Amino acid sequence: MAENHCELLSPARGGIGAGLGGGLCRRCSAGLGALAQRPGSVSKWVRLNVGGTYFLTTRQTLCRDPKSFLYRLCQADPDLDSDKDETGAYLIDRDPTYFGPVLNYLRHGKLVINKDLAEEGVLEEAEFYNITSLIKLVKDKIRERDSKTSQVPVKHVYRVLQCQEEELTQMVSTMSDGWKFEQLVSIGSSYNYGNEDQAEFLCVVSKELHNTPYGTASEPSEKAKILQERGSRM
């Protein structure tokens, strides 16, 4: 019975069999070469170490934009200064939190940003990786967001203050902290024993209502509290 012998080959530097502890026979070498070309083989996958977080994706995904940093990384561009860690992953010193939306865009062509992430952060990463279509998409999203914010109608809070004629000038002159005079309504006069009749007025004032992270309006200042106290006299 004939015996099967393997004719050993010296492992080529950087080629198939390198790092396996010895040479490979011609038959085994051909088999591994075919495996490397088979769809789904390890060679199509790329491991990235972005700011200490690992990402695993395909070369096809990273090569969506031929002008991008990631495309050049996959092509082993000699002009691109890139290192690998001990696991063989490409080292990229960027924020891994914002790399997720960038990678997902390359995977399916849609921009999906979690509500706790800022569009400006994604734009920074898109510009770093030089993904032209994503840069345009994020800029459009930022413009749309800013446009909606500017179209929100301004809300006002109104107060009606009651004062006598002698108090009117002082009250109007001391109004500040965003309060504005709106309308003055005469309500007749009041009679105090031993004094002359004094005209009384209702003074309507308003202030823009600004939203804050912890409520709908800021804490009133001392001058605003004075206006509120005068209004409570009604």
Swiss-Prot record:
Subcellular location: Cytoplasm, Cytosol; Cytoplasm; Nucleus
Residue list for modification Phosphoserine: S10
Modification N-acetylalanine, positions: A2
GO cellular component, one term: nucleus
InterPro entries (alphabetical): BTB/POZ_dom, SKP1/BTB/POZ_sf, T1-type_BTB
CDD domains in UniProt: BTB_POZ_KCTD5
Gene3D superfamilies tied to this protein: 3.30.70.2000, 6.10.140.750, Potassium Channel Kv1.1, Chain A
Keyword Phosphoprotein carried by entry: yes
Keywords for the protein's UniProt record, in alphabetical order: Acetylation, Cytoplasm, Host-virus interaction, Nucleus, Phosphoprotein
A biological process term (GO) from this entry: proteasome-mediated ubiquitin-dependent protein catabolic process
Location (main, coarse): cytoplasm
MF (Gene Ontology): cullin family protein binding; identical protein binding; protein-containing complex binding
BTB domain boundaries: 44-146
Biased composition (Basic and acidic residues): 220-234
Induction line: Up-regulated in peripheral blood lymphocytes stimulated through the T-cell receptor.
Classification via Pfam families: BTB_2
Keyword Chaperone: no
Region spans: Disordered: 213-234
Domain notes: The BTB (POZ) domain is atypical and mediates the formation of a homopentamer instead of a homotetramer. Homopentamerization is due to the presence of 4 residues in the BTB (POZ) domain: Leu-56, Gly-100, Val-112 and Ala-118.
PANTHER family hit by this protein: BTB_POZ DOMAIN-CONTAINING PROTEIN KCTD5, POTASSIUM CHANNEL TETRAMERISATION DOMAIN CONTAINING PROTEIN
Assembly, per entry: Homopentamer. Interacts (via C-terminus) with GRASP55/GORASP2. Interacts with CUL3 and with ubiquitinated proteins. Interacts with CRY1. (Microbial infection) Interacts with adeno-associated virus 2 (AAV-2) REP proteins.
Functional description taken from the UniProt entry: Its interaction with CUL3 suggests that it may act as a substrate adapter in some E3 ligase complex. Does not affect the function of Kv channel Kv2.1/KCNB1, Kv1.2/KCNA2, Kv4.2/KCND2 and Kv3.4/KCNC4.
Entry protein name: BTB/POZ domain-containing protein KCTD5
Natural source organism: Homo sapiens
